[in-house]
């Protein structure tokens, strides 16, 4: 099965009340999931969206995930390999922030063939705009 997933996270204050959302698309269906946390950060919410979307997909699938977070896209496609080798330390030898969520995201990706695409936020992409509105609504 081929799927597209649009994800976003938002935070009212940083830290503050946060929301995450994902829209999952296949050839004929569209579904959305979302959630919130009280004392969190925007980066944690950006990570929660793809984690929760991937958890929802039970069948092994070919998935393209669209995110407007370079933190998530670069982290999962590049930085995580180095973090694992360096015992979860970043290039400054400091512990990687949000390690718990990076591990969850990495594990969730193993079940599928995942391609990551960065898209510019607020640039007129229909699904990016929808997922942004949904994530922001969860911060209220």
Regions found by a protein language model. Name each.
Residues 1-44, 55-57, 132-133, 137-140:
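RNase H-like nuclease fold core
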């Amino acid at each position: 099965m081929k799927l597209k997933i649009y994800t976003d996270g938002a935070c009212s204050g940083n830290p503050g009340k946060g929301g995450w959302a994902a829209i999952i698309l296949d050839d004929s269906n569209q579904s959305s999931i979302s959630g919130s946390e009280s004392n969190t950060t925007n980066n944690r919410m950006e990570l929660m969206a793809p984690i929760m979307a991937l958890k929802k997909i039970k069948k092994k699938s070919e998935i393209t995930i669209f995110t407007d977070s370079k933190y998530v896209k670069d982290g999962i496609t590049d930085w995580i390999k180095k973090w694992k080798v360096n015992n979860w330390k970043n290039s400054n030898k400091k512990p990687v922030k949000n390690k718990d969520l990076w591990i969850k995201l990495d594990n969730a990706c193993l079940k599928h063939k995942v391609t990551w695409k960065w898209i510019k936020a607020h640039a007129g992409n229909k699904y990016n705009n929808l997922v942004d509105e949904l994530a922001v609504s969860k911060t209220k």
